[in-house]
Amino acid sequence: MPSKAPRKSLSVSFVWTFSILAVLRLTSASFRVIDDCDEVYNYWEPLHYLLYGYGLQTWEYSPEYAIRSWFYIALHAVPGFLARGLGLSRLHVFYFIRGVLACFSAFCETNLILAVARNFNRAVALHLTSVLFVNSGMWSASTSFLPSSFAMNMVTLALSAQLSPPSTKRTVKVVSFITIGAVIGWPFSAALSIPFILLELVDLKGRFRHLFCRWFKAIFVALLITGICITVDSLFYHRIQFVAWNIVKYNVLAKDGRGPDIYGTEPWWYYFANLSLQHNIVLWFAMACGPLVLLAAFTNWINLDSFLDLSSVISPFYIWLFIFIIQPHKEERFMYPIYPVLCLAAAIGLDMSLKLMIQILSSINETVRSKFPVRFVVLCVYAIIGCLSIARILAIQNYNAPMIIYPAISFLETDNNVTTNVCVGKEWYRYPSTFFLPDNSRLKFVKSEFDGILPGEFVESNSTWWNREGYYQIPEHMNEFNNEEPTRYTSLESCDFLIDLEFDHSKATVNEPIYSKSDGWIPVMVYPFIDTKQTPFMGRAFAVPFIEPKWGRYEILVKKPVKIDFSNLRRASKQQA
């Protein structure tokens, strides 16, 4: 274990590392596409309701089910209220909150890097820094307003604390961060603490007094955090609610057509494919880390204590993969909590691979070993990770049309005293949230081929933010079976604007006509959106110079006759460009 670095050099390292990571994460806050409708409807919309008194409501927020935490929403409302106090528009409030998420993620990642440098291995810390700097998976997850992203940051802090020498303080810190991530964020992230608990039992074997005192304090803090969360959520819902337990009940114990599987299932290899896209060869080094650690232990390359320490750090990655691979319902966001563990395992795997390679070369010929270009190989690995990650990030921008189109509605000349309806059909799941609409606009749904349940609307409220009626009133026409609710739809005649996506190969149906070719509507603003059916896989997954994507048209349509000041739209187009 390396000696501790001077406090001054560590503080300088923190400032520089945090600054670079913050800049990189802020690019995510500015440009990342919201690719999960759950993030919008279950988190951004309730946050908008808390801040402004109106927004869309999913069945999960009905007090009958209560599987979403208002405490989690309220925590993110703090920077929202600060941004409002600064006089920012609702769109800028959205990006301000994202910026706070970016900086918090950078803070957590910096703590992990310095913890690895102090207590583990400086070479691994360098590899970890490079992986985090250029990793497209972390770039996306860092600014997601999802409980799994929140849990990811808490796991990062817990992992940082775990790397310090054993003590009561370490145990309390690790348990506290895991509890915060599980109770306020996502309860399943608690499974990542299993290796640490086992390590503690091994370290304190036979010293029951120390074990009792250490864990008594840790459990007390965990219960305190849990009690605070239950209290806050119960105040919002106006009834006793333990949301984390409700989530577990719904996802694990639900029967009779309930549960997550009704929203779709994926094959066992889904996560390997997805992690390969998000982390490229970083995943390979992470997967190799476990076998390399076992090999090192069997060949006496590392002692038993080092083996236990390494195993407790990297095993959560494999445990998490196993747990979620066997679940039929799979989502990209379910992997977020292990992203920092994956990156650390990859850094360790890269370090051990290089050392193993050098050892093999030494056994062959010392001259060959001395000429082996270690630094060049490391730089090549970094370059491959960086190029693939940048290509992935750029490719995702091909889906950013909704983030451009919706704000442009505010440039259309409308009467601010009249509520306008912005309607969406098949594109309901790409809606970026009410933060992107003008103050006097409301999102409405028109019938499409989708036959599941769509969000309803919170009861609009002028009450103080902590006592809005939508928190505790039981809404009508909600169900947990994903059954279609016809009350969600509005007539096309009541729409003022319509958002649609059109491709050259689009075929009209009764419920999904090609609106731009109909008599009643005309597109007034169009933005390119990648055509995933006509673009080869490599062109969709990565920005490849020799593969030109095929494009569709993401459109704002208005009723005929058109009564719009087109100079405003031209100005909007220039600003977005």
UniProtKB/Swiss-Prot annotation:
Residues 1-29 form the signal peptide. It is a multi-pass membrane protein. Disulfide bonds: none annotated. GO terms for cellular component: endoplasmic reticulum; endoplasmic reticulum membrane; lumenal side of endoplasmic reticulum membrane. Residues 30-68, 117-136, 198-217, 302-305, 355-375 are extracellular. Pathway: Protein modification; protein glycosylation. Coiled coil: none annotated. The chain crosses the membrane at residues 69-89, 96-116, 137-159, 177-197, 218-238, 281-301, 306-326, 334-354, 376-396. Residues 90-95, 160-176, 239-280, 327-333, 397-577 are cytoplasmic. GO terms for biological process: dolichol-linked oligosaccharide biosynthetic process; protein N-linked glycosylation. Its main location: endoplasmic reticulum. Keywords: Endoplasmic reticulum, Glycosyltransferase, Membrane, Signal, Transferase, Transmembrane, Transmembrane helix. It is found in: Endoplasmic reticulum membrane. Its EC number is 2.4.1.259, 2.4.1.261. It catalyses: an alpha-D-Man-(1->2)-alpha-D-Man-(1->2)-alpha-D-Man-(1->3)-[alpha-D-Man-(1->3)-alpha-D-Man-(1->6)]-beta-D-Man-(1->4)-beta-D-GlcNAc-(1->4)-alpha-D-GlcNAc-diphospho-di-trans,poly-cis-dolichol + a di-trans,poly-cis-dolichyl beta-D-mannosyl phosphate = an alpha-D-Man-(1->2)-alpha-D-Man-(1->2)-alpha-D-Man-(1->3)-[alpha-D-Man-(1->2)-alpha-D-Man-(1->3)-alpha-D-Man-(1->6)]-beta-D-Man-(1->4)-beta-D-GlcNAc-(1->4)-alpha-D-GlcNAc-diphospho-di-trans,poly-cis-dolichol + a di-trans,poly-cis-dolichyl phosphate + H(+); an alpha-D-Man-(1->2)-alpha-D-Man-(1->2)-alpha-D-Man-(1->3)-[alpha-D-Man-(1->2)-alpha-D-Man-(1->3)-[alpha-D-Man-(1->6)]-alpha-D-Man-(1->6)]-beta-D-Man-(1->4)-beta-D-GlcNAc-(1->4)-alpha-D-GlcNAc-diphospho-di-trans,poly-cis-dolichol + a di-trans,poly-cis-dolichyl beta-D-mannosyl phosphate = an alpha-D-Man-(1->2)-alpha-D-Man-(1->2)-alpha-D-Man-(1->3)-[alpha-D-Man-(1->2)-alpha-D-Man-(1->3)-[alpha-D-Man-(1->2)-alpha-D-Man-(1->6)]-alpha-D-Man-(1->6)]-beta-D-Man-(1->4)-beta-D-GlcNAc-(1->4)-alpha-D-GlcNAc-diphospho-di-trans,poly-cis-dolichol + a di-trans,poly-cis-dolichyl phosphate + H(+). GO terms for molecular function: alpha-1,2-mannosyltransferase activity; dol-P-Man:Man(6)GlcNAc(2)-PP-Dol alpha-1,2-mannosyltransferase activity; dol-P-Man:Man(8)GlcNAc(2)-PP-Dol alpha-1,2-mannosyltransferase activity. Catalyzes the transfer of mannose from Dol-P-Man to lipid-linked oligosaccharides. Belongs to the glycosyltransferase 22 family. This is Alpha-1,2-mannosyltransferase alg9. The gene is alg9.
